[in-house]
Amino acid sequence: IRVFSVMPTLNDNGVHVGGIVGFLKSIGFAINMFNPTRVIIVFDGKGGSNRRRKLYSDYKNKRRTSYRVNRVAGLENVEDERRNMYLQLRRVAEYLELLPVTNISVDGIEADDAIAYIAKSVIPDGEKVIMSTDKDFLQLVSDDIKVWSPTKKKLYDKEAVLEEYCVTAENFIMAKIFEGDKSDNIDGVKGIAT
């Protein structure tokens, strides 16, 4: 939950619920903005990154921080903060069960892979909007798939990808291969991505 670090909201009992509030607000905003006929929310499955870590042991290795991302009273250290975030994620999943949305998590599969599969294969027809701050999804942009970045408040279609990144959506993954991906701890091609 990225909103965990920017929404230090406490409930009446002093329990940190910023991630829950921020997540549900962003989903509500997207529903109001795009008026979809169906909403699918996808989470990483248990052990979702294991397959990639077997191929490359440093995959996403830099993501575990040793510093505090949120300074909420009552959370004394990074482990308290992580535990609180996971509790909020569990509550978000419980709340989603009460809403008219499809909630998906498949053990051994990262959310990114499930989202790509759903957008391209499970729901092949009609316009789809992927809501994410992860630019990796820009490789999926096509005539019927767009990406909404809630942090940039921008909808990426093929033209927007080309305009911002000077590469077509179809070639976005190739550019990422050359550049590398710091968020996943993957180096680029030496001599090109220096």
Task: Label each residue range with its predicted role.
Residues 1-131, 137-155:
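Noncatalytic, basic helical substrate-engagement surface that gates or grips nucleic-acid strands
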Residues 179-194:
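Helix-hairpin-helix
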Residues 35, 39, 127, 170-173, ...:
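Residue-level signal for secondary-structure boundary elements
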Residues 132-133, 192:
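A conserved hydrophobic position in a structured secondary element of the catalytic/binding core
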Residues 154-183:
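A short, charged helix-loop
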